[in-house]
A protein has these predicted regions:
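Primarily recognizes Gram-negative and organellar outer-membrane beta-barrels
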Residues: 4-23, 126-142, 147-149, 161, ...
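Conserved short loop/turn motifs at secondary-structure junctions
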Residues: 17, 28-30, 46-50, 162-168, ...
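Glycine-rich phosphate/diphosphate-binding loops that line cofactor/substrate pockets in enzymes
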Residues: 106-109, 149-157, 282-286, 357
Length: 503
């Protein structure tokens, strides 16, 4: 199907004034063809994802690892169930701005597979380390992802997975190949296993510069090094109606990377166990669940990095209401060569679908946690609060609101390390079957960024689409009407799309 896409962006110039960019237009093309009843091929040239809703703000002040953002592009969500494995070697957000992408999905009674190829203009790097990850935006790349899965008896399966990304403008590359399986001995016992091997060739440029080293004195700086790595997951499960037990082992070698995946940390080995009890009282509580989880982690030098135990419970009540309570105690935690052995997490979470039209949830957390951004980390008191709600105000109007806040202080509560919040409002109005309007409004108190993204859509048929929208970001001091009016516009983009199926 041919599509006409247009856009115009404005950004701040060197004088801190908003400068309009040139208008841009291009033709996009998408072809979807059924090769057979269980096999579909799809190709997209200059695919347009500008109508996809912006990512929801996340709080990363005390986080040293890259954040995971949900894949919202419909093209990449199709077939995602096949590429989901214990080791996250496929993360389609690594294909950031494709100029061309093709895919074949085959789903048979026993054999299923997917092949995805993409040429990407702006490919991100996520470089895993022991205590942090490094991120950078690279250039053009060509990616291939293949996944094969064969179903066996009673839910067992065998699987193969392979990914390969080659940078176009330098010699950087990253490949992964692996095997995974789930084998069910009977209705009670099963084992899951995955092992993947990586081969990485770094580019020789300044995209990532760091004095830190890993493995056999490799540097995180992109200086043309090449190395291989391995990741492994092994888990044994015993499942009955009232008792479930899991025990397992996993590791990531210091040199393991997955350029098409989401692997943020390496150089760790972990042994864990979990026991879960389930009771069905058939009264006000339809299900009562309680459990314990314990884990010990080391790096590949034999240094113990963490030892903790988690107690958790879940109560199921009427109107799809669930109460979750979790307490985690870290008996030992080592970060930046500093021992922090008094940290813990306490979380209480309540979610409910109170009625067909109204859902809500809230989460409260009290923590003694490492202050990771300090040169010498210390323990601090962290308070987290969040809530969300979704409401169908009418047959045509849906509204959603979320709020997340974090505050960290010294142990004596006299000094704040940081304090702030993010909030998001979503609303959609469907005037009729063809005409609709959506708006996303969000504010990040940490970055002082206010964003609004309205979108008007008109779709009289499945293959005829017209939409027009914009994305606008402002720097504001606080979330108020006056502050928004006085806030400085930092960037703005307008876009439109017209798609029509010619017969």
């Amino acid at each position: 199907m041919p599509t006409l896409v247009g856009s115009q962006a404005s950004e701040l110039d060197e004088n801190n004034a908003l400068r309009k960019g040139a208008s841009d237009g291009e033709v996009s093309m998408g072809i979807k063809y059924s090769l057979s009843s269980d096999r579909v091929a799809e190709i997209a040239i200059n695919p347009d994802f500008s109508q996809v809703e912006a990512d929801e703000e996340q709080i990363d002040v005390n986080t040293t690892f890259a954040l995971n953002y949900q894949e919202k592009r419909p093209f990449f969500n199709e077939g995602a169930d096949l590429t989901d494995t214990p080791v996250d070697v496929v993360y389609t957000r690594s294909i950031n701005n494709p100029t061309g992408v093709g895919r074949i999905i085959s789903r048979g009674q026993k054999d299923s597979w997917v092949l995805l190829s993409a040429l990407d203009d702006d490919s991100p790097y996520i470089v895993p380390g022991e205590e942090q990850s490094f991120t950078s935006m690279g250039g053009k790349s060509f990616s291939n992802i293949f996944r094969y899965k064969r179903s066996l008896k009673e839910g067992s399966f065998l699987g193969l997975i392979a990914t390969d990304r080659r940078m176009v403008n330098n010699n950087g590359s990253g490949s992964v190949v692996g095997f995974d399986t789930r084998y069910r001995f009977n209705d009670t016992y099963q084992v899951e296993f995955q092992s993947v091997f990586s081969r990485t060739q770094e580019p020789n440029d300044s995209l990532v510069v760091s004095s830190a080293t890993f493995g056999d004195n490799h540097t995180f700086t992109f200086d043309g090094e090449s190395f291989s790595g391995n990741a492994l997951e092994l888990e044994f499960q015993r499942n009955t109606e009232h008792w479930r037990v899991e025990t397992g082992y996993d590791h990531r070698t210091p040199t393991f990377r997955a350029e098409n995946g989401f692997v943020t940390n390496s150089n760790h080995r972990r042994i864990y166990g979990q026991s879960l009890w389930i009771y069905f009282p058939n009264n006000f509580f339809s299900q009562v669940l309680g459990g314990v989880h314990a884990s010990v982690g080391h790096n590949f030098d034999g240094v113990q990095k963490a030892k903790y135990i988690v107690l958790f419970s879940n109560l199921a009540m009427p109107r799809q209401t669930r109460l979750n309570v979790m307490y985690a105690r870290r008996m030992q935690y080592r970060f930046k060569d500093t021992e922090l052995n008094g940290t813990y997490d306490l979380k209480i979470n309540l979610n409910s679908q109170f009625s067909e039209r109204y859902q809500f949830g809230t989460n409260i957390g009290r923590h003694v946690a490492p202050v990771r951004f300090l040169e010498v980390p210390e323990e601090g008191r962290l308070t987290t609060t969040s809530f969300w709600t979704r409401m169908q105000a009418s047959d045509r109007l849906n509204v959603g609101l979320s709020y997340n806040s974090q505050k960290m202080t010294t142990m004596d509560r006299k000094t704040d390390y940081f304090s702030g919040y993010t909030t998001t409002l979503r609303a959609s109005y469907q005037h009729n079957k063809s005409l609709g309007f959506k708006v996303l409004i969000q504010y990040n108190d940490f970055s002082k960024d206010f964003q609004i993204q309205p979108l008007l859509t008109y779709q009289p048929s499945p293959f005829t689409i017209f939409y027009i929208g914009s994305t606008q970001n402002q720097n504001v001091n606080t979330l108020s009407y006056d502050a928004i009016n006085a806030g400085q516009l930092t960037n703005r983009q307008y876009y439109l799309k017209f798609q029509y199926l010619f017969k």
